[in-house]
Amino acid sequence: MNDHDNSVHDDGAQHGWTARLGNDFPLRLAAGLAMGAVALTFTLAGAMPFAVLVVLAALVVSWEWGRLVHGKEAGIVVAVQIGTAALAGILAAVGLVGLALLALPIGAILATLLSLGRNSIFSALGVFYAGLPTVALIWLRSDAWLGLLAVVFVIVIVVTADTAGFLAGRLFGRSKLWPSVSPNKTWEGLIGALLASAIVGGLFWFVVPEASAVRLAATGAVLALVAQAGDLAESALKRRFGAKDTGTLIPGHGGIMDRVDGLVAVASAVGIAAIVIDVHSPARALLLGS
């Protein structure tokens, strides 16, 4: 084979990889990196700046959820969802985590009553969808001992699972995971997400040497599974209401909900686990266990 043949072969191979990744991959990558940089900056800046970012994101998520479920007739229900998310976030930021959690069921009941029977269950779920991860993330970051590292761990695992799942699915995906809900999800993508997250989780031992590398790896894999479940749940929600995306705010990704679905699920799971394992130190519960 001459040089020209090699060149043609290489170009064809490159074109094949590009086609599998999709024409929107560069835009998705750029948007993802930009969002990651913003999240990391606010996380490192301190507990209060991080809380501000989380609350702002929760307000947008509440808006997108309301528009998805109720359309242009969202009105007062969305106002309740947004107000509850803001109140819960503020209470958590000033250390009143118990009151923040109490605000969620109250807001959910109010949203249900105001929905007047129209998608009332989804009105209630919207309050928890935006509010619970908001409280959990702010609570996690406020942990004086390991809060910063715990939040970084969560974000890194979610990003790893999302990226590895996307790449493995696009490049090697053959077996559909749940085609009726998410046609592009594959078992190969799920396996790639779990393996990559387990590896990254185990490597986090170099950052937190007092933790168990095996436990961190297992935690990474479990959180990756939760993130993928969150992604599927949001896909099911969009399919239920006949929407492709929840918004157009982020190029290549859709709305904020489309980008943080995995983080919402993981943060909620971490918060609930912390209440059970070590309510006094959510970061310790995540990274070290009991």
Enumerate the predicted regions with their spans:
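Juxtamembrane/transmembrane-helix interface segments of polytopic membrane transporters
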Residues: 201, 205, 270-274, 278
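Juxtamembrane boundary at the C-terminal end of a transmembrane helix
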Residues: 274-290
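Membrane-embedded alpha-helical bundles of polytopic integral membrane proteins
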Residues: 2-221, 225
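Re-entrant/interfacial helical elements at transmembrane boundaries that shape
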Residues: 170-171, 238-241, 264, 268-269
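Final/C-terminal transmembrane alpha-helix of multipass membrane proteins
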Residues: 259-275
